[in-house]
Amino acid sequence: MPPIAHEIAASLLRAGAVHLRPDQPFTFASGLRSPVYCDNRILLGDVAARRAVTAAFTAHCDGAEVLAGPATGGIPWVAWAAETCGLPMAYVRGAAKGHGRGRLIEGVSVKGRRVVLLEDTVSTGESVLAAAAALRAEGAELVRCVCIFTWGWQATATAFSDAALPLVSLTALPELLDAATAAGSLSVAQRALVEAWVRDPQGWGADIS
């Protein structure tokens, strides 16, 4: 990844958006145990970090006529990047409105327009790929999806490949691990635990209390 990926990773750690706890794993609502927790909503309150992320997003908006994102995580980034680039924006609801015009996509019309999709975090990709399908159903031509962070799971890469949607991540787990190691907050043994989780997230952590 380019040098900016390491800068973004360091920004996420400084802002407290990412927590590494391989010896005391987090448990997600799904029951999945994880040595890493990422909440990029924290960045909304960190002016320096959000400016850095917005600038990084705009570098990947070439070729776009519209910027769009899924509700709710993508909305602020789409708004800031669209303002910076001087582009119109849209966002995709989780479900169509149950009243009024019953719209699923809000904002500018995407029909016949080249759209870059922005998201904060991509895990399995399920929600952002649903948004992509909705945009395509409205006639959008999707250029790429850009996210702040992704875990690097092979299943996610496969899902985006199957959807014929290029995925670009501003930073990823290796860069975060490099930043944490450089800061002295992650040992070599702890890093190995995190890397093992990436390879097998479902089976990881059975022997950790």
What are these regions (language model features)?
Residues 59, 79, 83, 133, ...:
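Short, well-ordered alpha-helices that flank and scaffold nucleotide-derived cofactor binding pockets
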